[in-house]
Amino acid sequence: GPCWLWALALGLALGPRRCPAAPLNASAAPPERCRRPAACERLRFGSCLGSALPYAHTSTLLAADSGSQEEAHGKLLLWSGLRNAPRCWDVIQPLLCAVYMPKCEDGQVELPSQTLCQATRAPCTIVERERGWPDFLKCTPDRFPEGCPNEVQNIKFNSSGQCEAPLVRTYNPKSWYEDVEGCGIQCQNPLFTETEHREMHVYIAFSSVTISCTFFTLATFVADWRNSNRYPAVILFYVNACFFVGSIGCVAQFMDGARDEIVCRADGTMRLGEPTSNETLSCVIIFVIVYYSLMSGVIWFVMLTYAWHTSFKALGTTYQPLLGKTSYFHLITWSIPFVLTVAILAVAQVDGDSVSGICFVGYKNYRYRAGFVLAPIGLVLIVGGYFLIRGVMTLFSIKSNHPGLLSEKAASKINETMLRLGIFGFLAFGFVFITFGCHFYDFFNQAEWERSFREYVLCEANVTIATQTNKPIPECEIKNRPSLLVEKINLFAMFGTGISMSTWVWTKATLLIWKRTWCRLTGQSDDQPKRIKKSKMIAKAFSKRKELLRDPGRELSFSMHTVSHDGPVAGLAFDINEPSADVSSAWAQHVTKMVARRGAILPQDVSVTPVATPVPPEERSNLWVVEADVSPELQKRSRKKKRRKKKKEEVCPERRAGLSVAPLTPSSVPRLPRLPQQPCLVAIPRHRGDTFIPTVLPGLSNGAGGLWDGRRRAHVPHFITNPFCPESGSPEDEENPGPSVGHRQHNGGRRWPPEPLPGGSGVTRTRGRRAGLAPIHSRTNLVNAELLDADLDF
């Protein structure tokens, strides 16, 4: 009786406590689904992965690879290698303890929930990729039912993950190493040792040689910019400017703390996939400086070879092939690199490299480097090489096909230019091929390097496991690493290209430029004799014709703007038509007389103008200033006009024989003063038949025009234009003095015909510029025709 009453009281007392725990949550599974029958045994290890367990019994039923608690404990130590993946380690610890050391009570073992299993899939992708999940850890519904609470979920694990070198801990998802969430690659490239880094940085410091050479080239061009600013030589100025700026971007890393700022992120990881919103722009700025300058420089190289090719084809002519095209050079050269740079920044493929100390495209993804670096450089190699070879062939053709037309100086310059072009082309193509070879070396071996690095990271994880299990620690090393020598050769190709571009100013002309510059800066006089081109001296004399008119005895002084110096790029600016640039003193002293003889110096009261009205005195001063820049299009139209005029003048003799010439019409423009007659240069002919003046033409009477008018210029012995004439007339001429003064020209020559044809003034000629004159067929009388024509503009 009393025992029964005691049992009843105990049941009533315990009943209310257990009843509230019986109802399950709406999301929780029934108790029979969250448990499984198993043999419970007392825990031999009171902790799991360093954290104390809140229960005393467990079972090895859920861990298929363990038959005892000792085996389960050993397997947990093996799984501890995931400490090197911090985010994975944070979520996998509860799962491992719930499987290897689950709670077991009353012959029932608790099953972990589906949520606990799924939480480990994304952070622990390295397990799936490297080993694969074992079957008992796969998130199947029978092993991991939905909505089952687990006692292990309430445990707070004290051990947190860590990142073994060469990985560092970071909370930036963009810095995480693949499949290892929470860790990123350290800023210093792990494929190279610390010693190799220092050696490479010392090597990069030698890029200052490129900076010095290119800067010297730029300074040389600027010092003599007036003579150097000519295409195609000035293109070398832009090429050297591009390589100078690019070299500045490479050595910017040597400023205090600049290298880490350029190639490292704030969390100590390597910059990959720039630009990003939460990082500084130092990496992007260095990339733009280096890449944009490099691409602009190689495109300028194409423009240089094209300019050489077209300029060499136009040697010996007045045609300027580059006139009007230089603006397109700038448009193409500056716009294409800009588009490529913007495209790279848009796809965020700028990576930092601690070895080179710069940011560039495609250090991680080599496909972008092939598309944005090798493809443009390869195209430049093909196009530039074509124009360079054509230019050399053109020079060789000029030298071999026209040896008699070339002066000794021009031939020497052609030989020098061909030699320099050959050396320059060899260096340029050699450096480009070296660059291609280094990049292909990277492309073919990058996958192997990445695989070796991944194995090294896994080996470091095994070191952690060996430390936990007191097993021998394995030796970890990166088996396949890139060659430092190849990296040096690649940088040497870049710096060597810049140096080769600067060699074009390593000439004697550069020394003379700097000597003149030093004399100009210090105020000293330059005692070197000046070389003046005849064309520039004549142009200077014509421009000073007003001063020469006022003072005929004065001597011309030529300023430095008239003196023709060789530019720094000697050998490219040569004239195959001018035998020498030196001018003799006798020739220079007679320049003023030549200008006067050509009709450039006129009396003050005489004005020659293309209009038919006199020019007022106050406007005559402006008539002497003539500035013209004839474009190729205007020259082409002028040539077409001359050809059409020549075709019109070519008429048959039958039509020309019946023409007559109308008398000259008076002009309101003042005529030039009559020049004195000059003595003849031949002896007096002894016989009448020796002269070239026929008395009467066939079919015409005395004094008639006709065919004689068209041919008179080739035979009439004028005293100025044709001095090879008798010094005095024949006796017949003395008896018949000929036409009166009104029928004579200003130079003393007779005007033909002496009187109009009988029966009228004849047919008016309209082919020439003035009525009354026959077509001009002789260049010897061109001066006479110009002086006669009142409408001609001198």
Swiss-Prot record:
<keyword id="KW-1003">Cell membrane</keyword>
<dbReference type="InterPro" id="IPR000539">
    <property type="entry name" value="Frizzled/Smoothened_7TM"/>
</dbReference>
<dbReference type="InterPro" id="IPR017981">
    <property type="entry name" value="GPCR_2-like_7TM"/>
</dbReference>
<dbReference type="GO" id="GO:0007417">
    <property type="term" value="P:central nervous system development"/>
</dbReference>
<feature type="region of interest" description="Disordered">
    <location>
        <begin position="723"/>
        <end position="773"/>
    </location>
</feature>
<dbReference type="GO" id="GO:0071679">
    <property type="term" value="P:commissural neuron axon guidance"/>
</dbReference>
<feature type="binding site">
    <location>
        <position position="363"/>
    </location>
    <ligand>
        <name>cholesterol</name>
    </ligand>
</feature>
<dbReference type="GO" id="GO:0009888">
    <property type="term" value="P:tissue development"/>
</dbReference>
<feature type="topological domain" description="Extracellular">
    <location>
        <begin position="16"/>
        <end position="201"/>
    </location>
</feature>
<feature type="disulfide bond">
    <location>
        <begin position="34"/>
        <end position="148"/>
    </location>
</feature>
<feature type="topological domain" description="Cytoplasmic">
    <location>
        <begin position="515"/>
        <end position="794"/>
    </location>
</feature>
<feature type="glycosylation site" description="N-linked (GlcNAc...) asparagine">
    <location>
        <position position="462"/>
    </location>
</feature>
<dbReference type="GO" id="GO:0007224">
    <property type="term" value="P:smoothened signaling pathway"/>
</dbReference>
<dbReference type="GO" id="GO:0005929">
    <property type="term" value="C:cilium"/>
</dbReference>
<feature type="transmembrane region" description="Helical; Name=4">
    <location>
        <begin position="328"/>
        <end position="348"/>
    </location>
</feature>
<keyword id="KW-0675">Receptor</keyword>
<feature type="signal peptide">
    <location>
        <begin position="1"/>
        <end position="15"/>
    </location>
</feature>
<comment type="similarity">
    <text>Belongs to the G-protein coupled receptor Fz/Smo family.</text>
</comment>
<dbReference type="GO" id="GO:0001933">
    <property type="term" value="P:negative regulation of protein phosphorylation"/>
</dbReference>
<dbReference type="Pfam" id="PF01534">
    <property type="entry name" value="Frizzled"/>
</dbReference>
<dbReference type="GO" id="GO:0007389">
    <property type="term" value="P:pattern specification process"/>
</dbReference>
<keyword id="KW-1133">Transmembrane helix</keyword>
<dbReference type="GO" id="GO:0034236">
    <property type="term" value="F:protein kinase A catalytic subunit binding"/>
</dbReference>
<feature type="topological domain" description="Extracellular">
    <location>
        <begin position="441"/>
        <end position="493"/>
    </location>
</feature>
<keyword id="KW-0472">Membrane</keyword>
<feature type="glycosylation site" description="N-linked (GlcNAc...) asparagine">
    <location>
        <position position="25"/>
    </location>
</feature>
<feature type="region of interest" description="Disordered">
    <location>
        <begin position="634"/>
        <end position="655"/>
    </location>
</feature>
<feature type="topological domain" description="Extracellular">
    <location>
        <begin position="349"/>
        <end position="371"/>
    </location>
</feature>
<dbReference type="InterPro" id="IPR020067">
    <property type="entry name" value="Frizzled_dom"/>
</dbReference>
<keyword id="KW-0812">Transmembrane</keyword>
<feature type="binding site">
    <location>
        <position position="65"/>
    </location>
    <ligand>
        <name>cholesterol</name>
    </ligand>
</feature>
<feature type="transmembrane region" description="Helical; Name=3">
    <location>
        <begin position="284"/>
        <end position="304"/>
    </location>
</feature>
<dbReference type="GO" id="GO:0005886">
    <property type="term" value="C:plasma membrane"/>
</dbReference>
<dbReference type="Pfam" id="PF01392">
    <property type="entry name" value="Fz"/>
</dbReference>
<comment type="subunit">
    <text>Homodimer.</text>
</comment>
<protein>
    <recommendedName>
        <fullName>Protein smoothened</fullName>
    </recommendedName>
</protein>
<dbReference type="GO" id="GO:0005113">
    <property type="term" value="F:patched binding"/>
</dbReference>
<feature type="transmembrane region" description="Helical; Name=6">
    <location>
        <begin position="421"/>
        <end position="440"/>
    </location>
</feature>
<dbReference type="GO" id="GO:0030425">
    <property type="term" value="C:dendrite"/>
</dbReference>
<feature type="topological domain" description="Cytoplasmic">
    <location>
        <begin position="393"/>
        <end position="420"/>
    </location>
</feature>
<feature type="transmembrane region" description="Helical; Name=2">
    <location>
        <begin position="232"/>
        <end position="252"/>
    </location>
</feature>
<keyword id="KW-0325">Glycoprotein</keyword>
